[in-house]
Amino acid sequence: MQRSTPKEMYHNPQNVYTAQFIGTPPMNIVSNMVKGIQVGFRPEKTSLIDPGDAVLSIQGRIITKEQLGAEMNYSIETAFGKVMVKTEDDIEGQECRLYIREKNVFAFGEDGNRIPVTEEIKKALEQVEKGV
């Protein structure tokens, strides 16, 4: 169990439980993207418009779209399961692509504990877009 301030737990979660406990909607955790690794990214740190420096790009289909003031909450089906995106990006149509910058990607081992995002993991994430 991680014991620290809510701000520290949000920005630097040490395990999957903490990563999903802090934040609304909770952090997306994908288990079948990179072998032996659980990949995490926060809905509000995910873009539907290419920022040009994303380390991870995932094709998806919008299931639901909910406007909450200036922000939109999307539920998106991907090859890796359903994920949530919270953004100001207002996308038309059902097909979309999710973009996540390197600084917003978290890696967790099979035991749920945080591990560093190594060069090997980054290369594996870059291959996801290529369908490798």
Labelled PLM ranges:
Residues M1-K35, P43-E44:
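Internal alpha/beta loop-helix hairpins
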Residues P25, K35-V132:
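Non-catalytic connector elements of ABC transporters
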